[in-house]
Amino acid sequence: MRSVEVTIDIKAPRDVVLREISEYSHPPVLHKSVIKSVQVLEDKNNVSIALWRLKVLGFTRTARQKQIVMPPDKMTNETIGGFARGTLESTFLYETGEGTKIVDRIEIRVPKWGKLLEIPIALYTRRMTEGILMEHKKDLESRYG
């Protein structure tokens, strides 16, 4: 298992940031180079399960994720099926004087046959997560910053 951590500051209120990063309708639009589609299978209270089609290392992969939103300052995404099953992303949001600080920690799990790919996948995941968070930053700061 490998872990990666990405930190970013966004000049927008914490509740708005949490709502935006946990929302399913914008990823295929805002992050279209990586996320091909999202289909929500279940959505009850702050727990949802969705089927994602993602572009990973040039290949389109499918993953089923369980998302738990814990307002006002935490969200988790666990891959429960498909590519990278067992991967856990924990997102923490902290209020700052200028907006919100996001700390995104991802514990990457790959199948035993994929151990040689663990480091490249970790590096790719870090770069992909930074890109997605930067897209959120640009979008939110254009509206709130």
List each language-model region with its residue ranges.
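Hydrophobic pocket/interface hotspot
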Residues: 17-21, 27, 50, 67, ...
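Intrinsic-disorder/low-complexity, polar/charged segments enriched in Ser/Thr/Lys/Arg/Asp/Glu/Gln
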Residues: 1-7, 47-49, 62, 74, ...
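Glycine-rich portal/gate segments that line the openings of hydrophobic small-molecule binding cavities
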Residues: 38-84, 134-143
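A short, structured loop/turn motif at beta-sheet edges
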Residues: 11-15, 42-46, 68-73, 92-101
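Residue-level recognition of well-ordered beta-strand positions that form the cores
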Residues: 7-9, 51-53, 68, 78, ...
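Short amphipathic alpha-helical signal-transduction/dimerization elements
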Residues: 25, 125, 129-145
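Hydrophobic ligand-binding cavity/cleft-lining segments
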Residues: 1-45
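Beta-strand/loop substructures that line and gate deep hydrophobic ligand-binding cavities in soluble
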Residues: 79-131
